[in-house]
């Protein structure tokens, strides 16, 4: 079982979403946004750090997933986003959480099936995947989508690991049978 905290970073609004993964089953635990007032940037970063730390304390996740920085047209906006993202990552690392990063395009591809999906499509699919009665707000939906992407990544990794183990086991069994057959211990019946 994994509890995954997804973060959609922003210098003014940082979305968060928490899900529990048990096998292939995903369960919604909570979501929302850390909103900062029109303050200077250091104070906003302090609020983001405190907010993420509070969420970690409340939900006790064992994994932390965050959206990667994308190229922005405005350099100042990109720098502020990077600082907000770094602040959230520091909160996770200070709470001994492993950090996983996902590109926005991959998140949309995983959740909606289209890497260029818009926020409304992401909200709709998050609502369906987690069987929510109401659509989460956009920033929270994005954060939940990031958590869902990480859950799918875990499931995919387990599938690959199991396939590799099966292949290794099959190869060992084949080698064993060939050895025993060549020594006359088994006779093939056709």
Curated annotation (Swiss-Prot):
The lineage's top-level taxon is: Bacteria
Molecular function terms from GO = crossover junction DNA endonuclease activity; DNA binding; magnesium ion binding
Q: Which CDD domains match?
A: RuvC
Q: This chain belongs to which protein, by name? A: Crossover junction endodeoxyribonuclease RuvC
So where does this one cross the membrane?
none
State the encoding gene: ruvC
Main localization (coarse)? cytoplasm
Q: Could you tell me the EC number(s) of this protein? A: 3.1.21.10
Residues involved in Mg(2+) 2 binding:
67
Give the GO biological process terms.
DNA recombination; DNA repair
